[in-house]
């Protein structure tokens, strides 16, 4: 494996938490941890869950949040390398990652999502990313048929420069998270595309 494709942290896989595994606790020590959950109102929870999951897996959650996504794959699958970019105009910070895990929605025989599941993906940072760590993006269809968008992360600055800029980095992360939530709501509201 080339140096540019090696993960920048050792504690991999903590974002891979299938339903009903708790998102509280169990995170690696020494990292700043974020766990955000946002209810998504949906007249048809199954359709909204499927649409949100497919949007997450096809990078559309990120694009809808205003990030550029460069990947040789149209879908998040383990091993896929992706570079997200955020910023204004030509001033963009590139953030290379590799997908660690992904989970598609589980459907019944009628093509409806079965309640009590979590789907999405998690990726880890590669050299050149401003932080070291991992982030997970999930759609959850609870056992009582509610749709929830979840974003988790554990990270630390990748260099002294980013450590000094950590207050700005945290503000940027909060802003991007708010954009993810808006994007998740739009994806869920759009319903699933053709299968």
What are these regions (language model features)?
Residues 125-129, 152-159:
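Short, solvent-exposed aromatic-acidic interface loops
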Residues 83, 122, 147-150:
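General beta-strand recognition
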Residues 1-89:
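Hydrophobic ligand-binding cavity/cleft-lining segments
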């Amino acid at each position: 494996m080339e140096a540019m494709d090696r993960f920048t942290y050792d504690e991999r896989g903590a974002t891979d938490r299938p339903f009903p595994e708790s998102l509280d606790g169990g995170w690696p020590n020494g990292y700043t941890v974020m766990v955000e959950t946002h209810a998504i109102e949906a007249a048809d929870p199954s359709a909204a869950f499927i649409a949100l999951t497919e949007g997450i897996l096809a990078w559309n959650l990120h694009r809808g949040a205003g990030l550029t996504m460069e990947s040789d794959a149209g879908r998040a699958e383990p091993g896929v390398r992706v570079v997200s970019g955020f910023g204004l105009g030509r001033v963009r910070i590139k953030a290379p990652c590799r997908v660690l895990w992904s989970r598609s929605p589980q459907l019944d025989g009628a093509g409806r999502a079965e309640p009590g599941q979590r789907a999405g993906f998690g990726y880890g940072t590669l050299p050149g990313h401003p932080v070291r760590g991992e982030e997970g993006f999930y759609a959850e269809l609870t056992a009582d048929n509610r749709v929830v968008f979840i974003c988790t992360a554990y990270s630390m600055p990748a260099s002294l420069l980013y450590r000094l800029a950590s207050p700005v980095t945290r503000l940027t992360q909060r802003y991007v998270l708010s954009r993810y939530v808006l994007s998740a709501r739009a994806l869920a509201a759009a319903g699933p595309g053709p299968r």
